[in-house]
Amino acid sequence: MSFSGHTARKRFGQHWLRDARVLDQIVEAARLQQDDCVLEVGPGRGALTERLLASPAAQIHAIELDRDLVRGLHDRFGSESRFSLREGDVLEAPLHLVDGGFANKVVANIPYNITGPLLARLIGRLDRPVEPTYDCLVLLLQKEVAERIRAKPGRSSFSALSVRMQLLADCSLVCPVPPRCFQPPPKVQSEVILLKPFPPERRLPIDLASRVEALLKQAFQARRKMLRNTLAGVIDPQVLEPLAASVGISLQQRPQEVAAEAWVALARGLNQDV
């Protein structure tokens, strides 16, 4: 079976990356070695799969939802001993390899409508860690989301997502990806980013992570308001004011002006549940 008769399906969010330069940059960013096993999410027609198989990686394990594409991928790569394929929804399908092991790196062209849930599954949440931790994830995302993930405090794109992701992983830009690099072209700009999740010893203790989550939820639901107004409803002002001052936070700041580490310091100083 060839892919020539298969058209992109909007319900699956299918936009196939076809730009050779971007495909090469994705593989290069993963820095694949002979002992690496790669989880590829949404291989589509196999343009990236082909390059991954040309790398030194020991194993490429792909998960594809579209049954027609699964047949085409089997026809194209089924004879490759280093390739395995699972049909299913990546939000629900087992992520382990066919032999029961786990990939240590992820490469994914994520359907933009499942970005949040998929990030949570692959990297976890502050108060719900994922095991095992991947060495790195190279992800093709909608530019707006990618910018929020790696935004700096004070930028309009800095959000609760920024804080969460920056407490879970090192985040960096690989390359911008304009719509013309896809078939069919999406209506939005995209970016490839590299995430390097922190090992367990660098992650927040669960109780502290839960307090950070509660603070973020409370503060960012009214992101244009000063912290004096958003946090006073859940923290006694007589506690909040000296605590904020002790960790270098001004209560006249808005939540998008406070760095991830400062949120942790604020949560650490609380002796009560938020």
Swiss-Prot record:
Record GO cellular component, one term: cytosol
Molecular functions per Gene Ontology: 16S rRNA (adenine(1518)-N(6)/adenine(1519)-N(6))-dimethyltransferase activity; RNA binding
Alphabetic keyword roster: Cytoplasm, Methyltransferase, RNA-binding, rRNA processing, S-adenosyl-L-methionine, Transferase
Residues annotated to bind S-adenosyl-L-methionine: H15, L17, G42, E64, D89, N109
Enzymatic reactions: adenosine(1518)/adenosine(1519) in 16S rRNA + 4 S-adenosyl-L-methionine = N(6)-dimethyladenosine(1518)/N(6)-dimethyladenosine(1519) in 16S rRNA + 4 S-adenosyl-L-homocysteine + 4 H(+)
EC number: 2.1.1.182
SUPFAM superfamilies per UniProt: S-adenosyl-L-methionine-dependent methyltransferases (SSF53335)
Annotated Pfam families: RrnaAD
Alphabetized InterPro entries for the sequence: KsgA/Erm, rRNA_Ade_diMease-like_C, rRNA_Ade_Mease_Trfase_CS, rRNA_Ade_methylase_Trfase_N, rRNA_adenine_dimethylase, SAM-dependent_MTases_sf
Gene3D superfamilies per UniProt: Ribosomal RNA adenine dimethylase-like, domain 2, Vaccinia Virus protein VP39
Superkingdom of source: Bacteria
Subcellular location: Cytoplasm
Function: Specifically dimethylates two adjacent adenosines (A1518 and A1519) in the loop of a conserved hairpin near the 3'-end of 16S rRNA in the 30S particle. May play a critical role in biogenesis of 30S subunits.
Assigned protein family: Belongs to the class I-like SAM-binding methyltransferase superfamily. rRNA adenine N(6)-methyltransferase family. RsmA subfamily.
Protein name: Ribosomal RNA small subunit methyltransferase A
Source organism of the structure: Synechococcus sp. (strain CC9902)
